[in-house]
Amino acid sequence: MNTTINYYNLNAKNFIESTQNADMHMAQEKFLQLLPGSASILDFGCGSGRDTKYFLEKGYQVVATDGSAELCRLAGSFTGIEVKEMLFQELNEIGVYDGIWACSSILHLPKQELLPVIQKMCIALKDNSVIYTSFKYSNFEGERNGRYFTDFMEDTFREFIKVIEEEWITSDVRPGKGEEKWLNLILRKIQK
């Protein structure tokens, strides 16, 4: 994970330029439709702050985190809120959020670290709340372009976790990246 964080610290401005204006409206709205009107959202690995800003402008309460100090600084400036620097593994809240938005973020965890983090995410959710997450659409796991990636396809993710609420595949919305595919998922925490 340190290699990935170093990548984002060194390339934060270029990353923001390539992602801040990406049109995530369809995924954002699918996610928001599942939340109460005054929902509290954790933007877990907020990157540029694009989605945090969108949710704030829609009137939601948002807590934003990222593992990269430089992305936290720049996203905080963009969104107007403090972005907490933390690793995914450091999430330690209980029943706080109505939704967790982990857009193209937890895919940077090795598969063996991913399930414990998803379990922590579920603990941080209120009952019957949802997680949105997305992964590059393939079966690759390892370092690519200076960052670690765990990719999934529908069948491999279903084998990995059994609580999928909804899934869909989209093309990359960044300019020049339309040939790249993404697996989008909504997971629901069920009341026990």
Regions of interest found by a model, annotated:
Residues 105:
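Hydrophobic adenine-recognition pocket in adenosine-nucleotide-binding enzymes
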Residues 101-102:
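A conserved beta-strand element that flanks and buttresses the S-adenosyl-L-methionine
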Residues 110, 125-126:
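Helix-to-beta-strand junctions that scaffold the AdoMet/dcAdoMet cofactor pocket
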Residues 98:
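Conserved acidic residues
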Residues 1-95, 112-116, 120, 130-192:
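Class I (Rossmann-like) S-adenosyl-L-methionine-dependent methyltransferase catalytic domain
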